[in-house]
Amino acid sequence: MAQNKELQERYSSLVLAKQRATSLFANLFNRSYEGTPTAGAVKIPVRDTEVVAGSNYNTLTGAELTAAATSYKTLVIDKDNYVNELIDGHTADAVPDGLVAERLDSAGYSMGIATDSALRDCLLTGGTSFDTTTALTKATVYEKVIDARTALRKAHIMTSEMWMAVSPETYALLLKSPEFIRASSLGDEVIATGAVGMIGGIVVYEYDNYADDKVEFILGNSVYCHYVDDWKVPVAIKDLADGAHIGSSAIQGRNVYGCMVSRPATVLVKKKA
């Protein structure tokens, strides 16, 4: 049974909402782009500098034209998430609403984990190693965070554009640091993002899915970390006619995406030995 477009959009939105709620990094990257993701590539704006040329205006001669401080890079959409949840014993037009909701939630969660892992790897491979491999301690964690912050400020990243994803071990050290501001002291809007606190003006998130247990923190930003996605095949419930599943259907859909760190020096990865 074919799904109408309105229902496909609703299902796709529900899956995407769960994906966003599950994935940390999908909410922290820059989502701006020009083009059509499903075509295989898009153009992403890359800010060249924080410094915008300016001078006094002359009422007689006007002002000299300057070029925009933004260039564009091509982001290849080369990753593919899919939804293919079997609904055994129910044809597409007879699936209970509760079961639909359950499968959409499951699909969104699985996609969120997969997306988060891909974006994590994008940061680790596209970022820059920071400092030495000496493990952080209660006495050094604040100093190292501030040193990393300073490096990004020198690269013209505003503190409000920075974010930090810390391992559970690093979070434990931050909790013992008097400079760390716990989430309970932050505004509701910040808490709603999943932040666990703030240090040096940087919003901090705990991340427990680093494949490399030597990673202590990543200091990233919402300017030069890019993530673009779109539904190549919107989510729908479809009858299975594969000759193997009788009287069954599946929730199916495909979400394509790509990610990039356009300025490696603005993503700092702190690892221990």
Q: Where are each of the predicted segments found?
A:
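Long, hydrophobic/aromatic-enriched structural stretches that serve as scaffold segments
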Residues: 64-101
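Short, glycine-/Ser/Thr-/acidic-enriched flexible segments
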Residues: 49, 211, 223-224, 256-258, ...
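Short helix/loop capping segments that flank catalytic or ligand/cofactor-binding pockets
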Residues: 52-55, 86, 95, 173-176, ...
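Extended, compositionally biased alpha-helical segments that mediate assembly or anchoring
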Residues: 239-273
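Short, Φ-rich (hydrophobic/aromatic) sequence segments
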Residues: 11-20, 24, 28, 144, ...
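Alpha-helical scaffold segments that mediate packing/assembly in large oligomeric complexes
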Residues: 89-157, 268-273
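N-terminal "assembly arms/tails" that initiate or stabilize quaternary assembly
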Residues: 1-73
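Extended oligomerization regions of viral-like shell subunits
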Residues: 38, 42, 46, 150-233
